[in-house]
Regions:
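Beta-lactamase-like hydrolase cores
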Residues: 22-74, 80-87, 151-157, 413
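Active-site-adjacent, His/Asp/Glu-enriched structural segments that form or flank metal-binding
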Residues: 111-172, 181-188, 195
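C-terminal soluble interaction/assembly domains
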Residues: 299-414
Length: 414
């Protein structure tokens, strides 16, 4: 009996030695954007790496700074990087920071609100009191909205106002320009009461009332900054526009006023009055911390990227794009709002090649000396990629755009 057991064990050991060993399955090493090395086991088409290596020898890069990171979202691993941690000015790719923070903080269903109230009494078609326009910094407030305001007064039977038209701009602080904006730029006015993107809300409201035959007896200029809090006011009308509507123009057309309006929605969230850019930065910093980076390594000055005080890195932009990709609530709002190469927005005339056209979705950025691009694309192997490219110190922005287009082509071509 003992001999049989010995013979059985010997046979098993002999078979184990003689049988060919199976190839070991690759071990997937968890790779994060913040890691110092690209995952060595990631299988990626060699020709793509060769193309990118070749682009690193472009004459443009000999005299300028580059921040570049390409990340495979499908494999969750970085595949190429160059100066990805350098802090550079993002230009309008700063709008990605603003947009992703806003969607995460406010939710895609968030709505911008502008409201009309009155005080006093209505006697025989005469309002003995004031009308209060309460601003919510809605950049989409338009002529139809203004007409609705005036018609709501008419529907109350009012044809005469023995009082004032008062602008309540207490939603935000009284700054009208962003930190670090150049005085000679065509800068938007940061007022909570907007009409057609212009700071002439109260004049237009008075004219709209007049067109409907409603007389305002007090011809003094509206008093800006009055707060309606603790006043016995009666609601007349509110007009709304959704965050996704605002994001669509903000990102596709790179609208600076829309971006600043979104920044102040973040700042005012939670009922903060006299909201400032500082309030918004607190929420941006919290998100940066959540994605595993140190907010102290960056500078966030405004929401649009107009400021010369903004400093981010390609790593930060890609980290936020990765966060959005893995958060369907954020990605579902962000992705459709990005410009599409060869199709619309600021990418309409770029990357019309067979493999990039309709494939690359990314935010562009342009300031004097700065050209940037950050977003998503699908590689020839079917993998979803996130990328960020910041060219700083370029004398001609067209050269930066050409370089970025070449990078995207290298990623998308077979």
């Amino acid at each position: 009996m003992i001999m049989k057991k010995i013979l059985f064990i010997t046979t098993i050991l002999w078979l184990a030695v003689k049988m060919p060993a199976q190839d070991a399955l690759p071990v997937l090493v968890s790779d994060t954007i913040a890691s110092d090395t690209i995952a060595p086991r990631l299988q990626w088409p060699e020709n793509v790496t060769v193309r990118l290596d070749s682009l690193m020898n472009e004459p443009l890069l000999k005299k300028t700074q580059l921040g570049l990171l390409i990340y495979d979202l499908t494999a969750d691993s970085a595949i190429y990087k160059q100066g990805e941690r350098q802090t550079l000015r993002p230009a309008s790719t700063m709008k990605l920071v603003t947009a992703i923070t806003a969607i995460d903080k406010l939710g895609g269903g968030y709505q911008f609100r502008t409201s009309l109230y009155y005080s006093g009494l209505i006697e025989r078609n005469i309002l003995r009191g004031n009308l209060y326009c309460v601003g919510g910094m809605d950049p989409r407030f338009n002529n139809d909205d203004m007409r609705a305001f005036a018609e709501s007064v008419l529907k109350m039977g009012i044809d005469t106002i023995c009082g004032r038209l008062i602008a309540d701009t207490s939603m935000k602080d009284d700054t009208r320009l962003g930190e670090g904006w150049c005085w000679d730029d065509d800068n938007p006015s940061l007022t909570p009461l907007l009409i057609g993107k212009k700071d002439m809300f109260m004049e237009r409201f008075r004219q709209e009332l007049n067109d409907l035959g409603i007389v305002v007896m007090d011809n003094e200029e509206a008093i800006a900054g009055n707060k309606t809090k603790n006043r016995p006011l009666i609601h007349l009308c509110s007009r709304f526009h959704s965050l996704d509507q605002v994001l669509m123009r903000m990102l596709k057309e790179s609208d600076n006023l829309y971006a600043e309006s979104v920044l102040y929605q973040i700042a005012a969230s939670g009922g903060v009055k006299n909201a400032s850019a500082t309030h918004a930065r607190q929420w941006i910093n919290k998100l940066v911390t959540r994605i595993g980076l140190n907010p102290g390594d960056y500078k966030f000055a405004d929401g649009s990227g107009l400021s010369l005080y903004n400093y981010v890195s390609a790593e930060l932009l890609v980290s936020l794009l990765r966060f959005a990709y893995h958060n369907q609530n954020v990605y579902g709002q962000l992705y459709p709002a990005l410009p599409v190469a060869g199709v619309d927005g600021t990418l309409e005339k770029r990357m019309k090649g067979a493999f990039t056209n309709g494939n690359v979705r990314a935010k562009t950025g342009t300031l004097t000396g700065i050209s940037s691009l950050a977003g998503y694309c699908t590689a020839a192997n079917g993998h979803q990629l996130a990328f960020a490219i910041i060219n700083q110190g370029v004398l001609r922005n067209a050269s930066g755009r050409t370089f970025q287009d070449k990078v995207c082509t290298a990623l998308c071509e077979p």
